């Protein structure tokens, strides 16, 4: 499926709503009654910058998260109040906990905090876990492990933490950590089981939690989306692993690689990304959505700009 690039949602413009905060991908508006309006844009970010807008990306993220929030509501309460638009989630405003719960089922990753990066440097003890010698890249771990990280301020990098460090720094209480750990591992187990039914491997993911007005722990942000998770195609995993090849995935890194080959992306201006590359990224997101959820992606009406539709649907929801 090819979507029209001019209809991509790059800038969210809702001046009538209060308390605006723009993240890398999502724009948030805090309403006086405790609800938060979360609009997923089509922005594709890397190198701490926005590279381009990928048509359909925000809708894929919102609707994939919706699929998983619905599928895991029996495990853990979540922040969802309503979905007035394919790109919009209305959530409960929470007091966010300052730790991200990353769960990993495989020795994988490319970031400085990933267990594969640390393992290849010779480290065997990380995040309070000891890994055996002799593991290979992308190998399944004996069991899923929690690898928490601190939530870095803008411009800083997340720092790896052991459970003991989480508690020593007072990021959460011991009782909260016990509940967070149980929730994260149960959510991951459900995700892996459902992904397997779809011919996929959920290799790793991250969860964010907050506290509601009663102090209860609530799942926030997103869950098992193509941005927060690593999904591989199960049918080719074993053969590719034995051959020392990377697992087949819904890889979007080709946009990042194209930019990195042409400039210093941290300091130079970003060159205009070709339309065919953006269309390819859009197709990957849509393929991922359909593979993960088993649903058919409902392409937006090209005759109405996405921002106009978002505003129309939000106006109707908030007036109701």
UniProtKB/Swiss-Prot annotation:
Reactions catalysed according to its record: 5-amino-1-(5-phospho-D-ribosyl)imidazole-4-carboxylate + L-aspartate + ATP = (2S)-2-[5-amino-1-(5-phospho-beta-D-ribosyl)imidazole-4-carboxamido]succinate + ADP + phosphate + 2 H(+)
Gene3D superfamilies linked to this entry: ATP-grasp fold, B domain (3.30.470.20), Phosphorylase Kinase, domain 1 (3.30.200.20)
Pathway recorded for this protein: Purine metabolism; IMP biosynthesis via de novo pathway; 5-amino-1-(5-phospho-D-ribosyl)imidazole-4-carboxamide from 5-amino-1-(5-phospho-D-ribosyl)imidazole-4-carboxylate: step 1/2
Name of the protein in its database record: Putative phosphoribosylaminoimidazole-succinocarboxamide synthase 2
NCBIfam families according to UniProt: PRK12607.1, PRK13961.1
Keywords from the UniProt entry: ATP-binding, Ligase, Nucleotide-binding, Purine biosynthesis
Pfam family membership, one: SAICAR_synt
GO biological-process terms attached to the record: 'de novo' IMP biosynthetic process
Source lineage: Bacteria, Pseudomonadati, Pseudomonadota, Alphaproteobacteria, Caulobacterales
InterPro entries per the UniProt record, alphabetical: SAICAR_synt/ADE2_N, SAICAR_synthetase_CS
MF terms (GO), sorted A to Z: ATP binding; phosphoribosylaminoimidazolesuccinocarboxamide synthase activity
Assigned EC number: 6.3.2.6
GO cellular component: cytoplasm
Protein family (similarity comment): Belongs to the SAICAR synthetase family.
């Amino acid at each position: 499926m090819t979507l029209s690039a001019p209809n991509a949602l790059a800038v969210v413009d809702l001046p009538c709503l209060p308390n605006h905060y723009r993240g890398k991908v999502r724009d948030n508006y805090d309403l006086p009654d405790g609800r938060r309006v979360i609009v997923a844009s089509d922005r594709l970010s890397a190198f701490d910058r926005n590279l381009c807008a990928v048509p359909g990306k925000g809708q894929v993220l919102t609707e994939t998260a919706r699929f998983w929030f619905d599928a895991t509501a029996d495990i853990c309460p979540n922040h969802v109040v309503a979905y007035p638009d394919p790109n919009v989630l209305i959530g409960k405003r929470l007091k966010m906990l300052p730790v991200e719960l990353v769960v990993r089922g495989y020795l994988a990753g490319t970031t400085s905090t990933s267990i594969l990066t640390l393992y290849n440097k010779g480290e065997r003890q990380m995040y309070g876990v000891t890994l055996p010698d002799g593991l290979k890249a992308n190998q399944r771990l004996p069991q899923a492990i929690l690898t928490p990280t601190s939530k870095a301020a803008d411009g800083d990098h997340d720092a790896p933490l052991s459970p003991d460090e989480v508690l020593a720094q007072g990021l959460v209480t011991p009782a909260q950590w016990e509940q967070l750990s149980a929730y994260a591992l149960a959510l991951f187990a459900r995700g892996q089981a459902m992904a397997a039914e779809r011919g996929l491997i959920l290799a790793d993911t991250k969860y964010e939690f907050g506290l509601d007005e009663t102090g209860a722990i609530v799942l926030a942000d997103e869950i098992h989306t193509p941005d927060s998770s690593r999904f591989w195609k199960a049918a080719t995993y074993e053969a590719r692993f034995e051959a020392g090849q990377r697992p087949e995935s819904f890889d979007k890194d080709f946009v990042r690689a194209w930019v990195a080959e042409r400039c210093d992306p941290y300091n130079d201006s970003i060159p205009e990304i070709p339309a065919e590359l953006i269309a390819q990224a859009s197709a990957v997101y849509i393929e991922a959505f359909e593979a993960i959820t088993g649903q058919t992606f409902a392409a937006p009406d090209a005759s109405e700009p996405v921002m106009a539709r978002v505003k129309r649907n939000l106006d109707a929801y908030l007036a109701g």
